[in-house]
Amino acid sequence: MPNGSIRNCANAVADTVRQTFSRKTWEHKEQLQTITEQKKFFLRKVRWQIAILAHFGFAISFGIRSNFGVAKNRMVNNFTDAYGEVHEREFLWTGAEVGMMESSFFYGYAASQIPAGVLAAKFAPNKIFMLGILVASFMNILSAISFNFHPYTDIFVMVVQAVQGLALGVLYPAMHGVWKFWAPPLERSKLATTAFTGSSVGVMTGLPASAYLVSHFSWSTPFYVFGVVGIIWSLIWMYVSSHSPETHGYISDDEKKQVTEKIGDVAVKNMSLTTLPWRDMMTSSAVWAIIICTFCRSWGFFLLLGNQLTYMKDVLHIDIKNSGFISIFPQFGMCIVTLATGQLCDYLRSSGKMSTEAVRKSVNTFGFTVEAMMLGCLAFVRDPVIAVTCLVIACTGSGSVLSGFNVNHFDIAPRYAPILMGIANGLGAVAGVGGMVTNTVTYQNPDGWKWVFLLAMAIDIFGVIFFLIFAKGDVLPWAREPEKEETFNEFVRRMSIKVRSLSRKTRNREGDTSYEKMEEDSEMKPCSKKVEARAPAEKSESSS
């Protein structure tokens, strides 16, 4: 690496540290639009009602995702229920067939990320969010029915799971679209983290709730229960939410003014899909800082979420019943830290104690560093108490990153936040290969967990350094420019110009130069004709 590049990287890190510990009072551009809102209980504010209801929506979605993972234990194995009755396996699926049915969900989930971001930027994001959970809820009920369609059960279930993945894949980009209209700049962290912590609550409650329903009733009960709950939630969401404060039914005038004036025009103008700054987005180092951190976060999250029970069983020799209860604590700790960090970040920014960039980099560095340190310890620890403590600290500390890179989309490009979220989540879904890597390295080899944790630690460290160097906290220049609305006639005109240009080049090669003169006199230059038309009129007015 050239000396200049090394010097620039060192300066970027030094500037971040200097901003973090400086006593300077930072004046945020958002504070220039000072509006006094009447103090009232936060649940009476519509934006907080939306945040809390979105929290439950994410919880339902992650509960739905846990249903099949729990139900399969009774479907493909001999099972003793809560009443002591033994049930024989109902389905003779192989491990490969079950794996194909489960993985089909993630294929649909990854495929819908980027299209969901574009749709959330173009249409009402609150309706897209609702449709995602509504479709997934219907698919959940259909899943319970589809398991009985022999002999094509596996194919039918794969299709249903893929559609369910497509539906739930729109949630994160759509929610970023919702906050684009509803979250004032200095409340983004706490509103967004309140909504997104629903995913941890869904994991924390979905697994034991599904296990209870499977054990006390049947394997199909969780599918029906979570499906019905999701449908009921969709009806409530449609009443509470709306596209923007201007279209809401019962929002107070005070809150409407508070939200719309603080957000300003940067987030309320429509955009043309043909004129989105795709090149600027994909060549922006700040955007790639978010994408890289999304990948790193997904790698660690999938590792700790999907494999911690297996790790406890194979390495720590903890019984599955006990490990299932223990797994609640990491998710609970993550929720607490995520909510607390969101409040802290907005306080530091609104009080002027730290700049937006310093806040994002600080909490991001803290979360990834704590997780990396604990994963490094897990590579060498074999004592169950110490190992479980490291797991809890790793998950708990990592909760702060949701107030770092995960809301940085709003800081650098608020109008394109749902699109950036879709791009980051879509590319970050590549981290799903981590499950395959983990299974390959640890198959009949408990010592392989050492290398799994060391690899995850290295990925976290890379994410910390990349974000420290390249992340930004202000709106980027290409995100400030108003979008050009291209009508159908303008599109046809642009295409006709290109066609005539190609035709002109062809004629020039053949020696026909009269076409250039003909094009100059054509209607392709309307501005000059208007000027010529105005000239006689101006002369006549001056003479009169």
Swiss-Prot record:
GO terms for biological process: neurotransmitter loading into synaptic vesicle; regulation of synapse structure or activity; sodium ion transport; synaptic transmission, glutamatergic. Gene3D superfamilies: MFS general substrate transporter like domains. The chain crosses the membrane at residues 50-70, 105-125, 128-148, 155-175, 194-214, 220-240, 286-306, 324-344, 361-381, 385-405, 417-437, 451-471. It holds the Pfam family MFS_1. Glycans are attached at N78. InterPro entries: MFS, MFS_dom, MFS_Na/Anion_cotransporter, MFS_trans_sf. Residues 508-544 have a biased composition (Basic and acidic residues). It is found in: Membrane. This is Potential vesicular glutamate transporter vglu-3. The lineage of its organism: Eukaryota, Metazoa, Ecdysozoa, Nematoda, Chromadorea.
